[in-house]
Amino acid sequence: MKKLIPLLVLVGAMASQGQDWIVNFNNSNLPNTTQHPDRLVRSAPGGPGITGTNYQAVLLFAAPGGSLNPAQAPARFRVSTTLSPGTWQGGDRTLTGIGSTPGTQVQMQVAVFDINRFATYAAAVAGGGILGRSTLFTYTIPTPPLAPDAADLVNFDGFVVPEPSVIGLGLVGAAALFMLRRRKAS
């Protein structure tokens, strides 16, 4: 399992609505600086950002020690012709049942799956189709007014699925080496 470049999710602009909180679920394509580390989801460390609307990111949340639950609909990654590869088309997500008191802690995580293989997040979990997960992190609900960079998610872990052509080329190369060795032995 290879590490993907750390992905940071901008979780800001939380607003209280009774027992619900609204989170802006995005991974902005900001310059890679100390204040805004690289937030792109990459296919391999240092590789290009992933694209394709078949890939989806889902925000998971729970009270500390609780079970992670998906927050509403997943966010689709951008089309292959995008100028912002590695980012998804996010938006507001509602976190229900976590309390609304400043100081309340919420555990969060992001998971990525391919809807061409699994239609829903639950199906991807059941079928072992999660392509990567961020490290679980704790977010503390702040006292308003909120800072725009309220929390960052780090260390997106996943694995790279090789293209079928790479596997095929590897097999052709291995067969050629085998035949060459066999030819020299004759």
Q: What do the PLM-derived regions correspond to, one by one?
A:
Residues 8, 39, 164-166:
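Intrinsically disordered, low-complexity segments enriched in proline/serine/threonine
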Residues 18-161:
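Mature extracellular "passenger" or substrate-interacting domains of secreted, surface-exposed proteins
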Residues 163-180:
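A short, hydrophobic C-terminal helix/tail in secreted or cell-surface proteins
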Residues 5, 12-18:
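Sec/Tat signal peptide C-region and signal peptidase I cleavage site
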Residues 1-4, 163, 180-186:
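Positively charged n-region of N-terminal signal peptides that target proteins for export
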Residues 6, 64-66, 117, 176, ...:
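Generic "edge-of-domain/loop-turn" microfeature
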Residues 6-9, 24-25:
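Short helix-onset patch at the extreme N-terminus, typifying the N->h transition
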Residues 10-12, 173:
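Short, intrinsically disordered, low-complexity terminal segments
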